[in-house]
Amino acid sequence: MKDTIRQLIQQALTQLVNEGVLPEGLTPAIQVENTRDKTHGDFASNIAMMLSKPAGMKPRDLAEKIIAALPVDDSVTKAEIAGPGFINFFQNTQALAGRLDAALADARVGVRKAGPAQRTVVDLSAPNLAKEMHVGHLRSTIIGDGVARVLEFLGDEVVRQNHVGDWGTQFGMLMAYLQENPITSDELSDLENFYRAAKKRFDESEAFADRARGLVVKLQAGDAECLALWTKFKDISLSHCQKIYELLNVKLTMADVMGESAYNDDLINVVNDLKAAGMLVESNGAQCVFLDEFKNADGEPLPVIIVKADGGYLYATTDLAAVRYRSGTLKADRALYFVDQRQALHFQQVFAVARKAGFVTHPMDMEHMGFGTMNGADGRPFKTRDGGTVKLIDLLTEAQERAYTLVKEKNPELAEADLRNIARVVGIGAVKYADLSKHRTSDYSFNFDLMLNFEGNTAPYLLYAYTRVAGVFRKLGKDFSEVEGQIDLQASHEQELAAKLAQFGEVLNSVGEKGTPHILCTYLYEVAGLFSSFYENCPILTADDEAQKQSRLRLAALAGRTLKQGLELLGLETLERM
């Protein structure tokens, strides 16, 4: 509907330019927003205030001329001026009902694919291998997954890239420790304890540390024995990650892994090409790039270190190689990096160097989708009681156990298998939704009690809202698709729910554009709340007549499908019963 109103305004502006009311050459970004008070219309635009100065007119006077020039459209009943010059639009409820009927018949719930399809790289998760995933990996994994799902739904060709840390000192450490302490494959599968023991040895013995670094050099040189051990460690670690991804219902597979090691052969080319471009400068023995736009507090240029003084490469080198691959080989139009916002400067520098060096050979927008930290109740980074890092598997296991206790209290008669399945869906969903519902760039405090609450903007509340819709149709022995008749919006609660359901497409477009799943969470929470009000105030099964009953069933069916589709795009499973 917003697009329709923008088009109507644009046609009116074109007419006013032709009439000489507006000067030629104006290209305003026409903004249309939902109104809060529906008595003053459904949508509002500030276009008259934006153009009053170039038009040389008062905003309200220009608004009158814009309204007079608006083409007639069945979807709008009237437009009127409000306040200093806003133009409020009232939508035709019959036209709205027609759009919702069409959405109910559509496999995509009325959501159109957005513009021309583009290839989008989504860089997400990216744990360092050789040890188990911890809570710090949660946000990149699930936010990236949610945005990737939305972009795919909107028509993008999404290429997921799990840029795992599968190269470097930690592998030399593990190999050196394995040489000292030969163990079986079964024992090696407990990678966390093995890593901890190797790290302790590395920190305590300089001789061991030297051996570990020497093995890294051999690994980088292609030593067959080192490569075989590295492959074993990597495979074990990736299998651990894959179990987490499956538990989280995240669309990441082994085929999406494109780790640091994948770019090894191109690192020397990155260095040589930067050198050929005259961009490399030696500083304290290291090879660096200095860009004028990045300076420290004293106004001195900040270095982007490409090669360390000891000849080693850094993250920037690998990230530059990844940019070349994503632009030159994948031919991506857009690359989204879901990495902690504390890395903002790093990515600003990498992107700037890549552009200046000509590494972006295929036009590609690069965006760092930074995120805040997940903290404990004390507002500090989430830790175990003894100050250690919380394993992600432990967190997810506890979430399921807590959910199991809650579900069993509410439904003690359920079979054990059903209890466990509901606990899994609710527990995992609660952890994911608590994160996804927060603004991506915000820090937040992890709280099991809040996220498992059946009231408020939580996964349990939304899952329950969906089961309420499903329950209506279960009583009738019908599916969402088996409802006849047409939607007829008479009661205010029907109209409010209908107007919200019609916004699904624009909400998804906003998520895809900004990389902010919390917008979708807020929307689904509002849909659930409006459905609850509709359900309580507009009898469905005991409606006044059959036409009203079918209309309300259709509205309920669309609410159910919207909730289910929205939760699926967030990576949350739904339940038919709770």
UniProtKB/Swiss-Prot annotation:
Span of the annotated motif 'HIGH' region: 127-137
EC numbers for this chain: 6.1.1.19
Catalytic activity from the UniProt record: tRNA(Arg) + L-arginine + ATP = L-arginyl-tRNA(Arg) + AMP + diphosphate
GO biological process: arginyl-tRNA aminoacylation
Any GO MF annotation of the entry: arginine-tRNA ligase activity
Family annotation (NCBIfam families): argS (TIGR00456)
Entry protein name: Arginine--tRNA ligase
Source organism (scientific name): Pseudomonas fluorescens (strain SBW25)
Top-level taxonomy: Bacteria, Pseudomonadati, Pseudomonadota, Gammaproteobacteria, Pseudomonadales
